[in-house]
Swiss-Prot record:
GO CC annotations on file: plasma membrane
Note on cofactor: Binds 2 Zn(2+) ions per subunit.
InterPro entries: Cellulose_synth, CES_Znf_RING, Nucleotide-diphossugar_trans, Znf_RING, Znf_RING/FYVE/PHD
Major localization listed first in the record, in broad terms: membrane
Residues exposed to the Extracellular side: 279-286, 872-876, 934-963, 1017-1025
Protein name in the entry: Probable cellulose synthase A catalytic subunit 10 [UDP-forming]
Function: Probable catalytic subunit of cellulose synthase terminal complexes ('rosettes'), required for beta-1,4-glucan microfibril crystallization, a major mechanism of the cell wall formation.
CDD domains with a match to the protein in the record: mRING-HC-C4C4_CesA
Catalytic activity field: [(1->4)-beta-D-glucosyl](n) + UDP-alpha-D-glucose = [(1->4)-beta-D-glucosyl](n+1) + UDP + H(+)
Keyword annotations from UniProtKB, A to Z: Cell membrane, Cell wall biogenesis/degradation, Cellulose biosynthesis, Coiled coil, Glycoprotein, Glycosyltransferase, Manganese, Membrane, Metal-binding, Transferase, Transmembrane, Transmembrane helix, Zinc, Zinc-finger
Amino acid sequence: MVAGSYRRYEFVRNRDDSDDGLKPLKDLNGQICQICGDDVGLTKTGNVFVACNECGFPLCQSCYEYERKDGSQCCPQCKARFRRHNGSPRVEVDEKEDDVNDIENEFDYTQGNNKARLPHRAEEFSSSSRHEESLPVSLLTHGHPVSGEIPTPDRNATLSPCIDPQLPGIYQLLLLPVRILDPSKDLNSYGLVNVDWKKRIQGWKLKQDKNMIHMTGKYHEGKGGEFEGTGSNGDELQMVDDARLPMSRVVHFPSARMTPYRIVIVLRLIILGVFLHYRTTHPVKDAYALWLTSVICEIWFAFSWLLDQFPKWYPINRETFLDRLALRYDRDGEPSQLAPVDVFVSTVDPMKEPPLVTANTVLSILAVDYPVDKVACYVSDDGSAMLTFEALSETAEFSKKWVPFCKKFNIEPRAPEFYFSQKIDYLKDKIQPSFVKERRAMKREYEEFKVRINILVAKAQKIPEDGWTMEDGTSWPGNNPRDHPGMIQVFLGHSGGLDTDGNELPRLIYVSREKRPGFQHHKKAGAMNALIRVSAVLTNGAYLLNVDCDHYFNNSKAIKEAMCFMMDPAIGKKCCYVQFPQRFDGIDLHDRYANRNTVFFDINLKGLDGIQGPVYVGTGCCFNRQALYGYDPVLTEEDLEPNIIVKSCFGSRKKGKSRKIPNYEDNRSIKRSDSNVPLFNMEDIDEDVEGYEDEMSLLVSQKRLEKRFGQSPVFIAATFMEQGGLPSTTNPLTLLKEAIHVISCGYEAKTDWGKEIGWIYGSVTEDILTGFKMHARGWISIYCVPSRPAFKGSAPINLSDRLNQVLRWALGSIEILLSRHCPIWYGYNGRLKLLERIAYINTIVYPITSIPLLAYCMLPAFCLITNTFIIPEISNLASLCFMLLFASIYASAILELKWSDVALEDWWRNEQFWVIGGTSAHLFAVFQGLLKVFAGIDTNFTVTSKASDEDGDFAELYVFKWTSLLIPPTTILLVNLVGIVAGVSYAINSGYQSWGPLMGKLLFAFWVVAHLYPFLKGLLGRQNRTPTIVIVWSALLASIFSLLWVRINPFVSTTGVMSNSFMGE
């Protein structure tokens, strides 16, 4: 039985005589201190010093005082908090206790008076009704006192008599080790509701959501985050307590790193304001146009920096606990309670996305460390290519050998191409004697599999005149990729074969949605929405994970990492997706074109994780299916608090421990009625369906659901399955027919698909728009960075391919900027946090920076050619302002690299490509976006090539591919080089006094050239040759600009020229 004390915030349990009793207090005399080794000693009154009144742990007074002042303030043995003894100095926690005046006398036992004192103590706790009625006890339930009394022995055996052999007839109260309890926490979170732990285990699952929400919230706040073991109920009770702990935690960056960083940011903001004030109030009269252009550019750069900087104010890391996830949902010997997950793989063109790459991704999914009956892999072939279909059939056969090999030897990664290409000691930690033999055999099997795939690829190079035919002689339905029916093929799963060990494999399903002329297909977003519907009809996983065809599972536990957040009752109900960072293979050593995007993934997204969560980056993301359906999140009052800067400066609105967390059952009803963001709630639909009393009302409800989700009763029924799985009323024989129906080209007509549900249409970068809509409804997202990267993919290392990729991203941002979903004006009545909105605004306006950036990069050349400058002669004070500005810029960069652990080279590559992309791809995106939105001139979607290098490592890096994107940066390079030559020539002709002003102009020009240096190397290529067409066009433009500027120099007065000409004559 458990009893409690409200005033002392602790519980005790009585032992019976079968337990090992604690030592009588009289035996403590002569004990050795268990910390320092000295004698325990006596008090001032000559009695044995007892540090802990609960267990009598031997501790001398010096160690006792040290532990209370500088230590944990708890007994090392029983973890009970030390009480203050008379004469001991007070510590902070003593202020909350009752005054202690006679602690020593209360336990002042000596050899001569034990008999006089112990009977009195025993009488106080005897089982007589007189004493029981006078001893009220308060229990704690959710932080509220509940009065109670110690029951009589015949009712509940409150006290177990343990007779001291030296004191016959006297009952001694034996206490368990005591833990200090937080009165605001539920007792269930400590595992101390019932002595019978077996009963608690049975009732645990019914109470887990309620308790975990309360407990995890306190855990993240650092209140009660450490849970001590009971030490008496055995390993089973400890296992139950461990299973109830949060499955993840927030790891804040050290304040020693963040505080200087924030101080420098504030100082930089102040210095920037002073600098801009100086620049705007000190024009250059003889170069007014150049000065005005430079000031406008600098003001925009300052605004752009603010948009980028503020969301990085409060970065965080996260840590997951896979062992707790297993204890809670996936115990050995019991059916797994992990949620079902549907994995989406999207591909379009097998010529640019090689089937072998897609096959490796699929194999890594099928071999993932997750219950096979909980995983389904859907491959979307939006190009309806028979090559993809046949390659997937070969992949399904090979997986029957590959999957058991991976699981038997627990290898990583589980994509065979990348596993066998690892240059590591593959025998490390592999103790099975059969491993080497089986690995060699598996490698031979994989080489044969590659040969079969390559034969299919070679065969697909020449398309037959009559189109492709299948093995049974029938025509391939997808011969016309723009006009074909929907196709679904289940390769593995319940209807497929078993692996070589006789075990079931995850489902593998091929899907190609229907396409017909006259229907808008919305590219990748439309294909993903088709996968949402077909997966809901066939498997209906509670969570969805999407990856590109070239992003394989590098960590077989990636899904479990995501489930640590998604299945956590405290945050899972309000988490729309878990985003993993993108990591890449096959990038050159120096990452010439910043393909790794390290600054974005390791700095920007960690900053957003401390606000409302990272943006969705298009791949490597695990979604909550309910969030994609447009439903409302389950929010608490904490989620509606001010933005993080206000919270950091002025504190939270919470008021200590007395704050009450809203009840879990009430959270689902939290909605904003005045929001212009469509918000749906599961309970609303339940009421719609169950609350009607007549068939007419039910018909109206059905029409509303069809208007939202489309005319598929099976799919609509699946949307109500919040935990996944198919409804019990579903007829398996009709599922494939219904699946074909939901991927038909006209299914989305007059529904909310692409508007409020699923992937959102309206931009080629559908990922940004989809994540923004979820955040606007109040959902949060999580950034998960496991120690072993979850996914790895390929990136375009060729300059032209890289620029085309950046062009597509920038074009999508411009489309969102000019749409109704623009974060500048959309969803202000929703639940999007201020700093999150600023981050989204920065995500869509960054291409506009290309215009001032282009102008700013041309300024050094014009200054050198015309012998003018954008800054007037400056005083010492102005010089100090400039030096402080540059110092603050570099100081903030260095401190940012320090807390993020990003390498300096990665940061510099990012800065260089910001200029390269800004003066090329971003500039083109602005004009293409304007033409597309206002003139209706659409641009073709270009799939980035994922083909691997066949001519050697990084051969693709040196291949030149012509694109008009190369012209603007090349022109900037040539103009600045011409300007440098002109400036030096002028200084040589003008004498020594002209070299001083020249230095500032040369530094300005070299700053531009240094940022464009990787671009210059890309132009030269392996043979150090630049294509003639690029040289001709760039030289022509540079010459035109230079001659035109010299001919109509606006900074030299016409009268001056005329006068000089006259005098020369």
